Amino acid sequence: MRRLLVPTLAVSLTALIALPFVVLLMQSLARSWSYPALWPQRWQLEQWLVLGAAWPSLAAAAWRSLVLALLVALVATGAGFFTSRALTRSALRQRWLALALLPFAVPPVVYALSLAQAYAALGLNGHYGGVLLAQLPFAYGYAVLLCRGYWTRHSRALDELALSLGARPAQVWWRVHLPLARGLLGVCLFQTALMSWFDFALVRVIGAGHVETLTLKVFDYLGAGDLRQAAAAALLLLGPPCLALLANPRLLWPPVSRVSS
């Protein structure tokens, strides 16, 4: 029984993960699908043909979404990794951590509406720079939370060892910590990029209709009441993250740091 338990759990988990994608795919190919049928009664490619006709605008939105997500991830991960070291070694680390996580205490829509007036006065509404600045506090707080687990007594011992051997502080960062934290930083980059890639509220409010991302395109189809077209667009939205996970499954969870073992 125990030998069958692990394969059974693995198959069940895989089926649960794959089920939403299968439903989306069937919905995107459905012409008619009524309750209580388990699959569409009639099929068609019309939804995908419509996406093909709209491909230039979708590709442009996907490219802008990707650039925005990469910028948010790079800034948030870099700042989060370097500042989490000072945070974990501070006597007030719990207060600093609470401050870094403060944006998560406010719903994104409320946060965006609170910033909208100030951003309008600064001329940031309707610009990608404004959306970037609005997304950064959330991504940075998450990066700090994720990276602080790297800074343990062992990492401090490595600091002292490298410095005692004549390494400069910059060399300790580049030759010791960055190589050891490479896996963790990859996870942090991927997950903070996803926060920007799937963001809707901040892009909608701060972007003020002038910032187009692929997520907004999906919600536009939903707003139009075309669930089949929205399902096809949602598969396009999920495609890049899924391809990244297939290429490197370790992006899904933080690795156990070698300095903490």
Q: What function would you assign to each model-found segment?
A:
Residues 36-41, 199-228, 261:
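Glycine-rich helix-loop "coupling/hinge" segments at transmembrane-helix boundaries
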Residues 2-34, 49-152, 180, 184-200, ...:
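Membrane-water interface segments at the C-terminal ends of transmembrane alpha-helices
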Residues 134, 159-160:
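Short alpha-helical segment that forms part of, or immediately flanks, the ligand-binding pocket
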Residues 153-158, 257:
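Short glycine/proline-centered loop/turn elements that form peptide/ligand docking sites
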Residues 39-51:
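Luminal/periplasmic active-site loops of membrane-embedded glycosylation enzymes
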Residues 251-261:
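Short cytosolic juxtamembrane segments of multi-pass membrane proteins
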Residues 160-181:
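Short helix-to-coil transition segments within interhelical loops
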